[in-house]
Amino acid sequence: MVTKTLSIVFVASEVDGLIKSGGLADVAKALPKSLKELGHSVQIVMPAYKTIAGRDDAEIILTTQLEHWPHTAYQVRSLSIDGISVFAIESGDYFERAEMYAENNQAYADNGERFAFFSAATLDLLPKLLNKKPDIIHVNDWHTGLIPYLLKKRYAENEFYHQTRSVLSIHNAVFKGIFHYDEIACLSEFKSHFVPEASISHTHVSMLKAGVQCADKINAVSPNYAKELLTELGSHGMASDFQDRESDLIGILNGCDYSEWNPEKDSYIPKQFKVNRISMVRGKKACKAALQQEVSLPQKDVAMYGMVCRLTNQKGIQYLLPILEQFLKNDLQLVIVGTGDPVLAARLTEIAQEHSDKFAFIEAYDNKLAHWVEAGSDFFIMPSEFEPCGLNQIYSMAYGTLPIVREVGGLKDSVNNYDDDIENATGFSFKNPEPMELLLVLMRSLLLYSQNLNEVKRVQLHAMKQDFCWNKAALKYIEMYRTTINS
């Protein structure tokens, strides 16, 4: 039996390699690439932000009109990433701006209208550009949540989309795309102020809710996050919507881009190393010494803890700060790299000044330094409040750095806790969002390091052998696509 090649349109608000603000962009680059490598037809649709429209390789291939819209004209630019065609929708009114979503920490006032337009234009352009009808339109987060709704309503009788099915990926349900009806009234379906699939009140709608209600299949970026979305806490108030669609909700853990995060080929780190004990021990020792020198910590062979994150409560800084000085009384070193909340940054700066022989805080995001922290640390701290998937724990394991995580979202799916399964352990974990629980697991890791360094090296090597490649994740997506098409 010949397996049908699928035609997939992947729609996202950002794509790594073109423009990026977070993990969505990583997925929007890596998953289509893997789907193509597995033999499927893939196109990407995204907005043509200012930096994209200005690229020399972004050729205008279509100038057209979007009916029933105040600003009807738009253009489509064509470019390529990893051999995949990208259609970038250009409209000076909406995307010719300095940033994607906000300036000076203020969201653009017309974000609702901007991404309503983007959703409508996406469905308008595909029949004009594609020779083959799409089997799947895969949309991501609230920015594209109206696409499944429009497919069900506006395009229900459209011959081009008659066999097309939609998949919505939830990367972070905190962001729901909530807007007043008037902000997206350019869509004729919303002029009446009565769209039950999207309404959260008499005056406001959620674009994410519209997608959850109308997509043929819903995907969370880890199996455990899919379970959390069924709870009020995990869904941030949308539990009933996800519960209504529970039979169509599936969790697939994101993959890792090993072309960038691979200690054997990493051009950033001072010494590359392979997945064998001798190479790992020598490589990590050299990387630790270089990291110590880079952040002005003493050259000592002590347990090195690393953390690279945004300084927000989501990342669990509020659990670390109350116990940090107590933890630093021990013989260890800690490097934290990140930017974000100025109050949290000020407190970390203060503690670093008081413990300059043990703790370095770098208030910046530096990709090279992030690689150095992953390679030079023995342990990586991720005490997240919530973490739909998480990637740093996967990067850490690739570099033989043991993640210390809270058991939420994808962290629970990807890290095997030492105290639960010593033989198959790849890190340490704790359950409850409490500073003392974090301190206990930190001390547990430090005790193992000080008493049985050989065991730490064994676990580090086992962690390096884990495989989270994107092609494995892509196979699960293909299975989901086929189930969606056949259901």
Swiss-Prot record:
Q: Which cysteines are joined by disulfide bonds?
A: none
Q: What is catalyzed by this enzyme?
A: [(1->4)-alpha-D-glucosyl](n) + ADP-alpha-D-glucose = [(1->4)-alpha-D-glucosyl](n+1) + ADP + H(+)
A Pfam family annotated for this UniProt entry: Glycos_transf_1
Q: In which pathway does it act?
A: Glycan biosynthesis; glycogen biosynthesis
Keyword terms, alphabetized:
Glycogen biosynthesis, Glycosyltransferase, Transferase
The entry marks the following residues as binding ADP-alpha-D-glucose, namely K20
For the protein in the UniProt heading, the enzyme class is transferase
Instruction: Please state the Enzyme Commission number of this protein.
Output: 2.4.1.21
Q: Which GO terms describe its molecular function?
A: alpha-1,4-glucan glucosyltransferase (ADP-glucose donor) activity; alpha-1,4-glucan glucosyltransferase (UDP-glucose donor) activity
Question: Which one GO biological process term can you cite for this protein?
Answer: glycogen biosynthetic process
Identify the InterPro entries for this entry.
Glyco_trans_1 (IPR001296), GS/SS (IPR011835), Starch_synth_cat_dom (IPR013534)
Q: Does the keyword Glycosyltransferase apply?
A: yes
Annotated Gene Ontology cellular components are: cytosol
Role of this protein:
Synthesizes alpha-1,4-glucan chains using ADP-glucose.
Name the PANTHER family on file: ALPHA AMYLASE DOMAIN-CONTAINING PROTEIN, GRANULE-BOUND STARCH SYNTHASE 1, CHLOROPLASTIC/AMYLOPLASTIC
Q: Which family does it belong to?
A: Belongs to the glycosyltransferase 1 family. Bacterial/plant glycogen synthase subfamily.
Q: What protein name does the entry list?
A: Glycogen synthase
What is the source species?
A: Aliivibrio fischeri (strain MJ11)
